[in-house]
Amino acid sequence: YETCKTYLKQQAKFLMLLWAFIAAVIVVYFLLLEHMGAKVLIILLFSLVGMAGSFGVAWYGIRVNTFANSRTAHASLRGSPWETFDIPMRSGMSIGMVLISVELTLMLFIMLVLPGDLAGPCFIGFAIGESLGAACLRIAGGIFTKIADVGADLMKIAFHIKEDDARNPGVIADCTGDNAGDSVGPSADGFETYGVTGVALITFVLGAVPDQTEQVQLLVWIFVVRVVMLIASFVSYLINNAVAKARYGTV
């Protein structure tokens, strides 16, 4: 986990550098071309919130997955089929529930707490930020995986050591890269996808439906369906967990 943490800290520095360039583009477009005035500050603030959301979910995901991988490996050594099934399921469900819950909370906060004239800029900034974070974490994670893999193979050939020899530091980097590519990227990507589709639906409703009463009804419907989906996923997990435990818990 320490190597994964080091990777994420480096990613955070790169994200802030990239955000500085995107922030400059936002200021030029929304302030100088669209003349949105002080609302540009709201867009910039919520772009940071969206980016922090993607990064936070990715950090949580890699932390849970790293420890879950270790515990699953030890459970398999004990010959426990139920534990080797239950630990990954619980960790995956935990990440999914946190991801969706954080996203829903942030979007509902924008919709219900902030003034209506600020909601639009907030959603614009939020969508930009989470897309930036997810794209960077997804792409950079994949690139890091490939570089670490190639580096480990080169050291293996140069020093005539085995595939996963602990003396090869590239092996540890490769494991970190696998976690980065298979955990950090999908977690941030899921957060971004869920948020951007929500913003797109809200934009479509406000732009395509002229009647304000119907707009409110449709917006409420969007969030009710999302909450129901969250509850249904959790109930499905509990049912699956109960059935699996009844069948394999005593094996």
Where are the regions a protein language model picked out?
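Hydrophobic, small-residue-rich transmembrane alpha-helices and their short perimembrane loops
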Residues: 1-251
